[in-house]
Design a protein with these regions (language model features):
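Alpha-helical adaptor scaffolds
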Residues: 23-30, 43, 54-119
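Canonical tetratricopeptide repeat
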Residues: 21-22, 56, 89-90, 124, ...
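TPR/TPR-like (Sel1-like) alpha-helical repeat modules
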Residues: 81-83, 135-156, 161-186
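Solenoid-like repeat scaffolds
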Residues: 9-17, 43-51, 77-85, 112-119, ...
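Single-residue signature of alpha-solenoid repeat helices
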Residues: 4, 38, 72, 106-107, ...
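TPR-repeat structural position
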Residues: 1, 35, 69, 103-104, ...
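Intrinsically disordered, low-complexity acidic segments enriched in Asp/Glu and Pro
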Residues: 176-219
């Protein structure tokens, strides 16, 4: 991606009017982590009325990533106006306000509105974390319970179980089993790291002995 992004940088895209081509370049620049270049390409497409609501959403994301909050807010309002029934507007606004260091209580309000319309394990977990930070222990526990019940496994289920353990509240048998599996896996990983370290240490010792033997032969 980085090589393709560098090549794209050197080309003149001002006369390109094909949306699919510009969209590809925007995606390449984003994948390469060059958000300023991706933003500039997205602005080019936006000024030509290409891409529709998806481009407005993406361009707002780029403005957020480069800390241009004034333009991000303006575009967010445009997106929200065009997407009155699109629940993703809550996530876009959440990303914007979080980047602006909004109070946790405000972020909770945004994610609660999103949760009313959409069930997503990532944002359910983030909501649970915000409940924890704002002292809403019961809401945090309940959200963790629902996340485990509805999704059953995966990274956010495991995070929810660990967060509930952090709360110090009673866990269900299913949650205890998940936590036990997490701890067992962690122990295995630590054991493997220790084994690898000892193998490397022994290898280094053997090489040192070999060098010593060669020096003795030279003498």
């Amino acid at each position: 991606y980085k090589q393709a992004a560098e090549i794209a940088k050197q080309m003149n895209w001002n006369k390109v009017k094909d949306w699919s081509t510009l969209a590809t370049i925007i995606n390449v620049q984003e994948a390469a982590g060059d958000y300023e270049e991706a933003r500039d390409m997205a602005i080019l497409a936006y000024n030509r009325n290409l891409g529709g609501r998806k481009l407005i959403y993406k361009l707002t994301e780029f403005f957020i990533k480069v800390d241009d909050f004034e333009n991000a807010e303006e575009l967010y309002r445009e997106y929200a106006k065009l997407s009155a029934h699109d629940v993703n507007k809550y996530i876009l606004y959440y990303d914007l306000r979080r980047a602006q260091d909004a109070p946790d209580t405000e972020l909770v309000d945004i994610l609660e509105k999103y949760k009313e319309a959409e069930i997503d394990e990532k944002y359910m977990y983030e909501l649970a974390e915000l409940y924890y930070k704002t002292g809403r222990k019961e809401d945090c526990s309940k959200t963790c319970d629902n996340l485990v019940l509805w999704f059953q496994d995966g990274i956010y289920v495991e995070k929810a179980v660990k967060l509930k353990e952090k709360l110090g509240v009673t866990m269900t048998n299913t949650q205890k089993k998940i936590l036990s599996e997490i701890n067992a896996r962690k122990s295995d990983e630590e054991a493997n790291k220790e084994r690898l370290f000892m193998e490397q240490k022994e290898l280094a010792r053997l090489k040192k002995d070999e060098v010593g033997d060669l020096l003795d032969e030279d003498d």
